[in-house]
Amino acid sequence: MAAPVPPGAYRPNNNQQNSGGPPNFVPGSQGNPNSLAANMQNLNINRPPPPMPGSGPRPSPPFGQSPQSFPQQQQQQPRPSPMARPGPPPPAAMARPGGPPQVSQPGGFPPVGRPVAPPSNQPPFGGRPSTGPLVGGGSSFPQPGGFPASGPPGGVPSGPPSGARPIGFGSPPPMGPGMSMPPPSGMPGGPLSNGPPPSGMHGGHLSNGPPPSGMPGGPLSNGPPPPMMGPGAFPRGSQFTSGPMMAPPPPYGQPPNAGPFTGNSPLSSPPAHSIPPPTNFPGVPYGRPPMPGGFPYGAPPQQLPSAPGTPGSIYGMGPMQNQSMTSVSSPSKIDLNQIPRPGSSSSPIVYETRVENKANPPPPTTVDYITRDTGNSSPRYMRCTINQIPCTVDLLSTSGMQLALIVQPMALSHPSEEPIQVVDFGESGPVRCSRCKGYVNPFMKFIDQGRKFICNLCGYTDETPRDYQCNLGPDGRRRDADERPELCRGTVDFVATKEYMVRDPMPAVYFFLIDVSMNAIQTGATAAACSAIQQVLSDLPEGPRTFVGIATFDSTIHFYNLKRALQQPLMLIVPDVQDVYTPLETDVIVQLSECRQHLEILLESIPTMFQESKSPESAFGAAVKAAFLAMKSTGGKLMVFQSVLPSVGIGALSSREADGRANASAGEKEAHKLLQPADKTLRTMAIEFAEYQVCVDLFITTQAYVDMASISEIPRTTGGQVYCYYPFSALSDPPKLYNDLRWNITRPQGFEAVMRVRCSQGIQVQEYSGNFCKRIPTDIDLPAIDCDKAIMVTLKHDDKLQDGAECGFQCALLYTTISGERRIRVLNLSIPCTNMLSNLFRSADLDSQFACMLKQAANEIPSKALPLVKEQATNDCITILHSYRKFCATVTSTGQLILPEALKLLPLYTLALTKGVGLRMDGRIDDRSFWINHVSSLSTPLAIPLVYPRMIAVHDLDANDNEENVVPCPIPLQSEHLSDEGVYFLENGEDGLIYIGESVNSDILQKLFNVRSAAELPSQYVLQKYDNQLSKKFNDVVNEIRRQRSSYLRIKLCKKGDPAGNMLFQSYMVEDRGSGGASYVDFLVSVHRQIQHKLN
């Protein structure tokens, strides 16, 4: 009999009886840690909390609510079709009296501290009052019963295909009873309707007459050309009613013992003195990735068009005969209201990963959705760029699209989603395929009365272990399939046996390395780092497994003996920075419970100890190597606070900025070489760190060039992260530094991880891309993997796939939880194969397609000139649209730009990418290096906001009393939408800009900033909350955005009258014509012209 898994991963001080609230709440405002909803109104970014001793017992952690079951369906679900393997378990499915494996439903905490559903009496997540139950029929994502089946083409209508987006260029078509322009869909900016034409019209209102018949097939296929369209549609699947929406994970943000908060200004230099007394850090929600709110970066989910409205065209078909090339008119004749722009959505939807045993295309990442895992893994964990797999490499090549997976295995789930089940097979371990080593999953088919199974990945027929056998039902499924999570859930955690362990699971080791050079002391960076570390000590896991260490460095390295037996910490100096060593290794890293008092005393005194330091040098490389030697036997997290360019010792660097001095402009010749590491020293060190499971996170608090391209190699190779605070201000950056450090420590994460993706026969992994170390071709090593990190897995064909069959993908992540348990997280995805090009375009996933384009551009920037990278990104977009225009929409006039519905925003996002920080011809080299590193591990939901930010009108917040969402609908990034009388807020997930027009009403300025004119605003802006409705709403908006982005935005002030501030803000108006490139309208004209050229 298998032993059950202890419920849930261990989290520090999970004591529901603890009288103190979590550190991210206002203490005293709630007595019960579960009463999250009642406390949401207290999440004010400028309210100082009462004193809270940093060394006291840790309050209930953020993700410490009891799990709540997923809302049950209120409608009768249809019986699964025969051979429908995956399916939802019944209500009491997890309680099995016997037989392996045992399933652990996480109790107080799910594995790795994942957020779970809070109590049912709480309002919807986001802290807004409940508006009643969420009825599937009213807000759920369309639940198609899979994808249209391949088959012969249907009838050929006389208009553009359903799902296509025509944009007319030239003179508007004549209006009459039989022809009218498509009406706006109601989204901001008036995008076209996404639905199919009315019954019987077949798109006739933009028709150019019937297509010619008898078109020959093109030369692009060998043998008979496959049909383009099938008669299948996207019918709605079953709907169900969910319970009330749940509250979010608790917020992040308020450090103990905080004083007044100071804001940030991008225009003034921070003072050259040590940090002032601790500031009041805003307390705002810090939760899951961006899902709720304004959904500004994509259209809301819509019913996918049915096939009968699409023309039957032939794969390889060329342009229509006698087709004339219409000249492109001036942009002034284009109806701006018909240009595709991101829309917005409101209420959450419920999304089932499979419906009637067929894959269900995922909703956009910009939609707030609750996933019901019915066989495929949630799209939060794994997304495919195309939700139907092309059967041949030729078909994929013709489409021009990427075939890749974006995998985020530790992603935060929605609070109302079912936590990931933990399955324990005992000493035998999970059932696996003998040939490919794939793990048992819902798509393995059991035969011979359950005595054998067929692997869905390699096709091998294997013997079922005797203690895992079970009879089959009349539908061919195992009778216990719905009772076993591994047979009915796309995502599951297996308990790993000793077979998966090279050594015992590593303890939780946190080592802090602080720059105390003269510049770091004078700018206040050292004091800010010490203050942040001291405040997060209470957030570290408690218990005997938690160890800490600390060291400082300038031109030498200083370790500290923190043994309790000593009256005070003892400094141990390492002067040799060429051949470093660690003195008294056993005394440098000690249990947190033994050294907490000494550690707090040391952190308070470090800024004073080095106050008179005159050493401008930094032995960064040597200090990191010495800290690694101390951690070599255990592994762990090394957090480095760096302020100046490493100049002495191992890995010393010189200022490479443009041979000239000052700043390296990205537009200079061969500038891309400055984005490559100076040498291989730090890279070689990083590979060794990864081998011993040491993850390095880098906090760069600088006011000058630090050669980000070189030093970021360490975190990128070890699964870490780079945080950049440039130019560092002791008045405004400590709040962000504290919140970044706290989230780094408390977010769900795993350690000493190894990941591999397996694919069905015919598809194989081509390449992995992200923050990791790769020593063998098939696996990637991750000393740490957290909920914010994503990995791109590009795929390629190695054989032809069968049309109508399903292609399977399985990602397996072996990792150690924060509590020291070894687990295997398995993600499964099974999606259909198709021979029809039109199906590829219909099922394309814009979010992951663009995320791949973004990551590939970032990978190419260090090795290519910027104009070439921009040109490649634009050409990729044109290739995709040309393929659709040529093979799927050849019946329309060349005077129209036809965009596939699923990818209608691809031109806008491509334009935004070419104008973004990474591809601008001006700017600092370090800024570009940071951008490249940031994009490397960026998750899919954050990819589009990074290049196409969200902008809202702050001055109109008072008028949005009836809005469901805290964050109002976004405004297009076009200067014509900016009023001189308005105040606007723009955010991209990293930075927030407040733009103030020249003629803003003094009452608005008084309410928001407590001044009568913009000239009175101080250079160091402080975001305050005043006693009026507008100020309160703006603070709520900032809090909500920070929660959505899981990021503490650096807020900067941009006044139109100030040249630098105005230029900074205008650089984000990507739809305008400017030095960065063409306007959105001009770009569409250019894309259309190039498509016409290719067609001719």
From Swiss-Prot:
Family: Belongs to the SEC23/SEC24 family. SEC24 subfamily.
Record field: compositional bias (Pro residues): 47-64, 79-92, 108-122, 150-160, 171-186, 246-258, 287-303
Organism field: Arabidopsis thaliana (Mouse-ear cress)
Name used for this protein in its record: Protein transport protein SEC24 B
Summary of subunit composition and partner proteins: Component of the coat protein complex II (COPII), composed of at least five proteins: the Sec23/24 complex, the Sec13/31 complex and Sar1.
Entry binding sites for Zn(2+): 433, 436, 455, 458
UniProt-recorded Gene Ontology molecular function terms: zinc ion binding
Keyword Metal-binding attached: yes
Job of this protein: Component of the coat protein complex II (COPII), that covers ER-derived vesicles involved in transport from the endoplasmic reticulum to the Golgi apparatus. COPII is composed of at least five proteins: the SEC23/24 complex, the SEC13/31 complex, and the protein SAR1. Acts in the cytoplasm to promote the transport of secretory, plasma membrane, and vacuolar proteins from the endoplasmic reticulum to the Golgi complex.
GO CC annotation: COPII vesicle coat; endoplasmic reticulum membrane; Golgi membrane
Tissue specificity as recorded in UniProt: Mainly expressed in pollen, roots, stems, petioles and hypocotyls, and, to a lower extent, in leaves and cotyledons.
Keyword Chaperone in record: no
Lipid bilayer topology: Peripheral membrane protein
Spans annotated as Disordered: 1-315
UniProt cross-references to Gene3D superfamilies, sorted A to Z: beta-sandwich domain of Sec23/24, Sec23/Sec24 helical domain, Severin, von Willebrand factor, type A domain, Zn-finger domain of Sec23/24
Subcellular location: Cytoplasmic vesicle, COPII-coated vesicle membrane; Endoplasmic reticulum membrane; Golgi apparatus membrane
Biased composition (Low complexity): 12-23, 65-78, 93-107, 140-149
Domain of life per record: Eukaryota
Source lineage: Eukaryota, Viridiplantae, Streptophyta, Embryophyta, Tracheophyta
Chief localisation class: membrane
Pfam families documented for this protein: Gelsolin (PF00626), Sec23_BS (PF08033), Sec23_helical (PF04815), Sec23_trunk (PF04811), zf-Sec23_Sec24 (PF04810)
Biased composition (Polar residues): 27-45
InterPro entries: ADF-H/Gelsolin-like_dom_sf, Gelsolin-like_dom, Gelsolin-like_dom_sf, Sec23/24_helical_dom, Sec23/24_helical_dom_sf, Sec23/24_trunk_dom, Sec23_24_beta_S, SEC23_SEC24_subfamily
